Amino acid sequence: MNTLFMHCRPGFEGEVCAEISEHAALLGVAGYAKGKPQSACAEFVCTEPDGAQRLMHELRFAQLIFPRQWARGAFVELPETDRISVLLEHLADLPVCGSLWLEVLDSNEGKELSTFCRKFEVPLRKALEKAGRLVDDARRPRLLLTFISGRRVFLGLAEADNSALWPMGIPRLKFPREAPSRSTLKLEEAWHQFIPREQWEQRLNDDMTGVDLGASPGGWTYQLVKRGMLVTAIDNGPMAESLMDTGLVTHLMADGFTWKPKHTVDWMVCDIVEKPARTASLIETWLGEGLCREAVVNLKLPMKQRHAEVRKLLDRMEAGFKERKVKVSIACKQLYHDREEVTCHLRRLDLKPH
């Protein structure tokens, strides 16, 4: 159980390796990271037997930016027939699990294996329950089986409350037909990622005001309108008629980087294609000056040193808020619907809700 296995967006294996190595060094967990380019996964192999468990115990999964899912465990080679007996053998020394997820990688090979996983899950679940290895209990660890092929699986464990919200970290969101662009799913996923479901009524409701910087044609505005908010859309480009017809949107032809609201708004969202450092200073201004209470903003990533750049900008924002003596929580994740970008969520903790 000395390997930490992580899923990620294909092409971001290096970022996962850099990020987990940094955390491991800070926590004094010895080991090395490896990830094949475009494989959609990376590993951190610990030199001590309890290394992976220590990492998962000391870190919150939500702190990690690039991994989509994680599990501690080991690879198991499977025979062509009677895979279940081999898995049961390996599970004998592990704790009884409280849930089971079968996962595949976000690659063409992974997609081909998903049918096999669907068929295999039913008999496997029955066998695990019969053997007393699987019970229905959220407090127990989750058993995560990531199939690399029909003959090779990563047999891993993770705590249900300290791992991805969805299998492989991939949300099943349906594209709403009336939304003006596919980017709408990025913001919807961000709500799920950063705001506990039981707080949606309180933090995303129709008494609120929102601003969408760089709004055209309105993919992100659509999500704010769907929650019943009054939205100011800032963009020199056109907005979708369907959004304007709701009567909830005011469209101002202005530059998203210079426009400011007269009063504090509840939400600012921004998905502008711009150098990440410029977007980061925009975030600093909006939260630092109390122009908004919460924000979801995308940072577009450079081609190289992507983890280092994100880390630098997050540290800079944190230092900026400290200097201004304002309390802001900062979270950052590469969402499933993100491409060469990460999504930041920020919240002023010292502003009274309206």
Curated annotation (Swiss-Prot):
Family membership noted in the UniProt record: Belongs to the class I-like SAM-binding methyltransferase superfamily. RNA methyltransferase RlmE family. RlmM subfamily.
Key word Cytoplasm present: yes
Name of the protein this chain belongs to: Ribosomal RNA large subunit methyltransferase M
GO molecular function: S-adenosylmethionine-dependent methyltransferase activity
Binding site for S-adenosyl-L-methionine: 183, 216-219, 235, 255, 271
Catalytic residues identified in the record: 300 (proton acceptor)
Organism of provenance: Pseudomonas entomophila (strain L48)
EC number: 2.1.1.186
Reaction equation(s) it catalyzes: cytidine(2498) in 23S rRNA + S-adenosyl-L-methionine = 2'-O-methylcytidine(2498) in 23S rRNA + S-adenosyl-L-homocysteine + H(+)
Keyword line: Cytoplasm, Methyltransferase, rRNA processing, S-adenosyl-L-methionine, Transferase
